[in-house]
């Protein structure tokens, strides 16, 4: 897989930023279709099925179980061509969490996603004062 669409870097960065603000931070699942090409969406998180329907089902299942996934702050959004990486902070199930999300954009829509989530340790256990972000 290669980086393409270098001329669309800023456009793709804005698409992902808007998705984060509208859907992940704003919790507006009704806006999800604005960011995808129908149900076409490749998901690399093994706990979520492919397709926008898989994403919505996973988010809905978490909510039904009383598990919240909150994106409080987007610290940085790095982009090159059709790839956009967002580094965010929030909570998962009430625990402070860092989110690293990588998206591939195709034809102005989010097409593919990889992610890593990590619980942020209590500051009293840190071996330095650099912080997670």
Question: Where in the sequence are the language-model features?
Answer:
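C-terminal and inter-domain tail/linker signature
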Residues: 1-133
